[in-house]
Amino acid sequence: MLDFMDYIQLAFSDASGWNRDNSYSTLTDTAKALLDFSTPERLRVHLSSLSTPQFATTYTLGTVGLIDGSVSYLFSTIPLDKTPSRSALISLRSLVPGYRQIYPPAVPLDLGLEWTLGSSGNTGAAEQALSNAYEDTGRSERKRKATLLHATLHLPPPTTLTALFLHRPSPTTKVSVALWSSQATNISKSASPQASILTQLFHDTGKYSTEFLFSTDNTLFGFRGLWNFGPDPRDSGGRNIATGNVKREKTSCPQSVALLSAGGEAYYSPTSSVIGLSTGVRFTTLPAAYDARSSSTSPPTLGGAGGSQIPSPISTFPYTLTLTLTPLTGSLSTTYSLLASPNLALSSRFGFNVYSWESEMVAGCELWRNRKKINLHNYNPDGSVDDLAWAKRKLGLLPPLESSDPASSSSSVSPTVSPVTSESVIKLRVDQSLRVRLLWEGRIKDLLVSAGVALGPTSAHTPSISCSGGSSSKGYSWTGVGVSVLYSS
């Protein structure tokens, strides 16, 4: 489960219009979420709050064996008032990484221009002001650039400070500066504190993306790039200023059923003479491949009944294939991830080294459990439970429940009944050495809880239970168990 600060950072990326999927660093994110998830190793409690739309705090306390804690603060120039911050209202799927659906490449638009328009109720005036801002890029009243500041202080010695600075100087550019500093230990008090800075420059055009990075640790220079095959989204239209309006939606390649992306990365450190090189390919299905409704928004085809024809789905299940190669070390890795149903995802990975002939096989899955429909008459507008809410609505003390959409009036779902939401998820992964990880994440009242256990072969010095049932120096036992609790307001 993501930390609250990571959740807010993703909300910042979405609010600023940044596509985090169009990057080589996220090429294998789906397989990593299903196969490389971590389980809690002890008891940890997180208390978080989005006190204002632009300021968030988090306090963390860990116990069992070693007591530690941390304090985190975050500030964003973009108001995140539309981001659910209460743990009772946050969607569990937005906190638990799983199968990630990739969408067609899109041209990054300057969505931040709307931030300076305020919360005006006049939509026409807002669109006209937005259009004028596009026409005159030199206006002094242009928006503030999207910026995020985040700092975390780990309190127990050795004290560690981590900080992050994110800035969006343009719709296609993002700058990231990360700082890590650790206090010297008692043994080496005379030594200077350890610190390193990582600077990254991202550029995304929709068709391709590049990333330049520099780290003060060993003076490391790096480059990453990703290229999307197929139509160029920059040639599919863009902003329509002639009509006085600006398209708020991202322009994307129409009727794309699959996406093939290829990229690579290279690193070099002149200090330690270290060279790194890798390349990878990703093939994934797009929503148009299995959802016929996405085709209904495309221009009608000639020759059909009534002048239009909606094509049928091409594939039943969304899937993602990746292939990565590290030439210098001879490592080859392939992954296959499948979304068998809205509540079930499967993934597998096979790795092979051509130099040592070592191989790796990992399989994993995640299974979601949906919550039963609840009666909204017993809930206040803020989400709190109130058995007398229905009476207060009759007396006019609470606003009435919103009626259902006329377009969906044929549906059997009542407007007084909440839609089905995800309540919990179970993740399981196992490799060729029979190392198993089992993770349960769900909601208990207003708390978000993660509980996991890791099992595997134990070393000769670790007491365990042997296969015959007696005590033995070698066997199979748990290697980690823990619980993590998150509450946010």
From Swiss-Prot:
Tell me yes or no: is Transmembrane among this UniProt entry's keywords. yes
Membrane association type: Multi-pass membrane protein
Query: What protein name does the entry list?
Result: Mitochondrial distribution and morphology protein 10
According to its UniProt entry, this protein's organism is Arthroderma otae (strain ATCC MYA-4605 / CBS 113480) (Microsporum canis)
Subunit organization: Component of the ER-mitochondria encounter structure (ERMES) or MDM complex, composed of MMM1, MDM10, MDM12 and MDM34. Associates with the mitochondrial outer membrane sorting assembly machinery SAM(core) complex.
Protein function: Component of the ERMES/MDM complex, which serves as a molecular tether to connect the endoplasmic reticulum and mitochondria. Components of this complex are involved in the control of mitochondrial shape and protein biogenesis and may function in phospholipid exchange. MDM10 is involved in the late assembly steps of the general translocase of the mitochondrial outer membrane (TOM complex). Functions in the TOM40-specific route of the assembly of outer membrane beta-barrel proteins, including the association of TOM40 with the receptor TOM22 and small TOM proteins.
* UniProt domain comment: Lacks alpha-helical transmembrane segments, suggesting that it resides in the membrane via beta-sheet conformations similar to those predicted for other outer membrane proteins and porin.
Presence of keyword Membrane:
yes
Q: For this UniProt record, give its keywords in alphabetical order, as a comma-separated list.
A: Membrane, Mitochondrion, Mitochondrion outer membrane, Transmembrane, Transmembrane beta strand
State the PANTHER family in the record. Answer: MITOCHONDRIAL DISTRIBUTION AND MORPHOLOGY PROTEIN 10
Which GO CC annotations does the UniProt entry carry?
ERMES complex; SAM complex
User: Family, per the entry?
Assistant: Belongs to the MDM10 family.
Q: Where in the cell is it found?
A: Mitochondrion outer membrane
GO BP terms, alphabetized: establishment of mitochondrion localization; mitochondrial genome maintenance; mitochondrial outer membrane translocase complex assembly; mitochondrion-endoplasmic reticulum membrane tethering; phospholipid transport; protein insertion into mitochondrial outer membrane
- What Pfam families does UniProt report for this protein, alphabetically? MDM10
